[in-house]
Amino acid sequence: GSVGRMMPGMTSRILDPDTMEEIPDTEQGLVIYRGGNVFNGYLKNPEKTKGAFHNGWFITGDLGRFDEDGFLFIEGRLSRFSKIGGEMVPHGTIEQCIIDAFKFDQSDGYVLAVMGVPDPGKGEALVLLTTLELTVKELRQKLLEANIPNLWVPKVIKQVEAIPVLGTGKLDLKGCQDAAQAALSS
């Protein structure tokens, strides 16, 4: 759903995350904004400030789009996408497709996480971390039956005792990334 419209005094733009060029607001891209309520930078940390802004606009790290009525829809975090063969592949969407296809229950906590790891041929490759027993063949079959593009099907599955989470209950992206990297090394 929508997170609403921009507050009065705020301006936003949608950028192509690769080129940082402005694209139509109704296309999915990197959300940036500026306004009187946006901070000016990190205290005594000009390098971090430089990375957080683009030409005076704050870089949210969110991928989103606006509808015709000006409502903003956040569709993911840039850090939760992989670029594979030039295409942006959303980890959260793949995770939800796997949960739906296999009718997995995550009411007691995470049972899976999709992560991107470097791949010399395609840029990145997808690794599925899961607490459940699942084969690549089963995964591929179910996702293709659900009309998920082949490019979005994780090629590596790593069974883990638990999906790394933070004290807040959110995915520990660093822990998941480390586990995904380790899966390729083993």
Residue map of PLM features:
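Conserved AMP-binding/adenylate-forming
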Residues: G1-D69, L78-F81, I94-C97
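Generic structural signal for residues in well-ordered beta-strands
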Residues: S12, V111-V114, V156-I157
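AMP-binding/adenylate-forming catalytic domain of the ANL superfamily
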Residues: E124, I148-L171
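Phosphopantetheine-dependent thiolation modules in NRPS/PKS and related acyl-activating systems
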Residues: K170-S186
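Generic structural signal for well-ordered beta-strand positions
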Residues: E22-P24, D67, F73, L166, ...
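Short glycine/proline-enriched turns and hinge-like loops at secondary-structure junctions
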Residues: I23-E27, G76, G123-E124, K170
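AMP-binding/adenylate-forming catalytic core of the ANL superfamily
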Residues: G35, N40-G41, L63-W152, G175-D178
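Short, ordered coil/turn segments that flank beta-strands lining enzyme active or ligand-binding pockets
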Residues: P17-T19, E68, G121, E161, ...
